[in-house]
């Protein structure tokens, strides 16, 4: 499923949409194989943002060594290129210990840069484009530009509101990759297939996945997402990248009195379902991906996973 240099370790990659069960499967497999986990999640990489990013619990982190979780200050710029650099270093250390490497996450851009290095620009999203064009027609191009500024202030600072085509394009890239267009474009091309790898994409039935997302969203709010957000805002993280992610945007609206708690839960679940759909669309384009339906461990090819 991927060919790399002879000295590069085999990576077992567990990918898939949010709430699909990646963490639980990866921990079970890593425990069985005596391996370590490298996260490929563009939000869990930040410190302090714990509840809203659904980080592994303290028990899960203790069960198997995890890397690139809570590794970056929230105010630090962290691109796909930087992720690749840090992941390469961690993978080399794990391999030097003679332990299997499991890469786990739903940020498709991180995985593509790590495995292949080659970034293909994502295609258009007709529904999103139509929505944004309607917003521009109804409320002005500045309204679309403000939406870009919320998720990608760096690109927004470089584009005037009048450049609607490029503003919409930047929002399309963010919608499909989960990272700002500025970070996407900073990533450089490298030789494809940088590691030998086995890529498994968790793909539960849509109704099951959406049910899991709805349940987890409510659980995150019950665990204190609004309170965590209030504390993070007080600590000065209002302008940080993770504060612009789904869940924190809505929780902040509750803190600031712009949404009720139930409205925030509903909106977070809705936006998360949309993101999960885009994640699956992304992974369907990945060469060599093996899609698994639950129960995942039973669906794994015999002898095809997790060799030291």
UniProtKB/Swiss-Prot annotation:
GO molecular function ontology, one term from the record: tRNA dimethylallyltransferase activity
Enzyme's top EC category: transferase
E.C. number(s) listed in UniProt: 2.5.1.75
Pfam family, one: IPPT
Stored InterPro entries: Dimethylallyltransferase (IPR039657), IPT (IPR018022), P-loop_NTPase (IPR027417)
Residues bound to substrate: 18-23
Swiss-Prot/TrEMBL site (Interaction with substrate tRNA) positions: 107, 129
Keywords in alphabetical order: ATP-binding, Magnesium, Nucleotide-binding, Transferase, tRNA processing
Catalysed conversion reaction: adenosine(37) in tRNA + dimethylallyl diphosphate = N(6)-dimethylallyladenosine(37) in tRNA + diphosphate
Region Interaction with substrate tRNA, residue ranges: 41-44
Signal peptide: none
Cofactor: Mg(2+)
Binding-site positions, ATP: 16-23
GO biological process: tRNA modification
Domain of life: Bacteria
UniProt family annotation: Belongs to the IPP transferase family.
Subunit organization: Monomer.
Job description of the protein: Catalyzes the transfer of a dimethylallyl group onto the adenine at position 37 in tRNAs that read codons beginning with uridine, leading to the formation of N6-(dimethylallyl)adenosine (i(6)A).
UniProt protein name: tRNA dimethylallyltransferase
Lineage per the UniProt record: Bacteria, Pseudomonadati, Myxococcota, Myxococcia, Myxococcales
Gene for this chain: miaA
